[in-house]
Amino acid sequence: MAFIISIIIAYLLGSLSFAVIVAKLMKLPDPRTTGSGNAGATNMLRVGGRQAAFYVLLGDAAKGLIAVLIARFLNVQGVSLAFVGLVAVLGHLFPVYFKFRGGKGVATMMGVLLGLSFWIGLFVIATWVIVVSIFRYSSVAALVSAVAAPIYTIIAGRTDYLFPVLIIAILIIWKHWENFQRLRKGTEDKVKL
């Protein structure tokens, strides 16, 4: 029963689109119809600046972390806990409150990973920061950190988390597919930090 309750909470929390919420609160254009059209922190950086992007990043990561922490509190463990994290990411990608049009899941993945294992989460965040600092492409940082997440999970000895973390990584790569096509064509926008 605790697992089912955790799954429901994770999906409902994951469905909170902080890009849309922050845009409304700050009286900014809807990120789903402006910039890249993505309801995420990188597009909010373009649409509303650093402060708006920071709030979105914080909110999207926090909901993933909180979903996992609630499940931990309810004594959900091992692969079941990692599946709760996966459902939080699915909520972000396909939010029930926003007609199933969500973001790409990177910040939520980071929050989930911090909740599963502080060190795995920290290394994934560090990987993203290093890659975006070098290449200035959020999509490249997303790809590298998504690929790194299952690798770090194995290195940390948390093979019980591996299958759900692998699914999260595949979903994030899939959601960035258009970005990778733009990278190939040389039309992908760089991030201005």
From Swiss-Prot:
It catalyses: an acyl phosphate + sn-glycerol 3-phosphate = a 1-acyl-sn-glycero-3-phosphate + phosphate. SMART domains: G3P_acyltransf. Its EC number is 2.3.1.275. This is Glycerol-3-phosphate acyltransferase. InterPro entries: G3P_acylTferase_PlsY. Pfam families: G3P_acyltransf (PF02660). Belongs to the PlsY family. PANTHER family: GLYCEROL-3-PHOSPHATE ACYLTRANSFERASE-RELATED, INNER MEMBRANE PROTEIN YGIH. One of its GO terms (biological process) is phospholipid biosynthetic process. The keyword Membrane applies. The chain crosses the membrane at residues 2-22, 51-71, 78-98, 112-132, 154-174. It comes from Coxiella burnetii (strain RSA 493 / Nine Mile phase I).
